Amino acid sequence: MVSGLSVGFGARVLLRDVSFRVTRGQIFVIMGGSGSGKSTLLRALLGLHPPMAGEIRYGGEALDRAPPGRRDGILRRFGVLYQSGALFSSMTLAENVAVPLEMHTRLSAGEIAAVARLKLALVGLRGSENLLPAELSGGMQKRAGIARAMALDPEILFLDEPSAGLDPMTGRRLDELILALRNSLGTTVVLVTHELDSIFRLADDGIFLDGERERVIGAGSPRELLAHSREQKVLDFLTRGGDRASTEETRA
């Protein structure tokens, strides 16, 4: 649960008084155009950007007030795929997936290898354990990144623009994988995206950020927002593609 959260840099506030709740097993989408504060909010949720005000609670525990050992335990419940999705280029896929297992578990080398194979199979990369990232397509690299993010069986999977740079068909298949992971494992997903197709395919609930007004201007599923929002910026985004529509208007 996020309550009264304000985040920024120095004295500059980027978002004010952000509040929302993510239900277990939900796909919760953080929406908004470029520069709206989506990535900054994500960093705050991951404990990487201290809030200026308010609090972030996981399972009733306030992240910023938890003692270091307990805080590490909370963060270990998270799996993260950042927008870069960077895999270690000199490591095989299995070795990439093994990194968090080697850092945070006491499994033997054989057990780690078995888990890595399982996670790669989970995302549709069975038999690809010994490939290097450079041998993969963009979509396969994103899948491998998700496999690594799922290595420790996280309660919450955070995905930052996972479809960025992918063609529409590959993006659709990645969305289908995200849905399958949620449906089969019950994993809660927090998704940052401005991809309209992904938003409508995936979102159970979400918030819409307005960087100019430094706050949330919409909350609910995309269909609820379309039906009930009176914010023109929200309606434009959900009907015309947000950033794409703004770019077209500027060119006109």
Per-region residue spans from a language model:
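Helix-to-loop junction immediately C-terminal to a conserved catalytic motif
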Residues: 46
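Conserved ABC transporter NBD signature motif
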Residues: 54-62
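Conserved ABC ATPase "signature" region
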Residues: 62, 109-127
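ABC ATPase NBD coupling module
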Residues: 63-79, 109, 225-229
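Conserved ABC ATPase signature
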Residues: 132-136, 140
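A short, proline-enriched helix->beta-strand linker immediately N-terminal to the Walker B motif
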Residues: 151-155
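Catalytic Walker B motif of ABC-type/P-loop ATPase nucleotide-binding domains
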Residues: 157-160
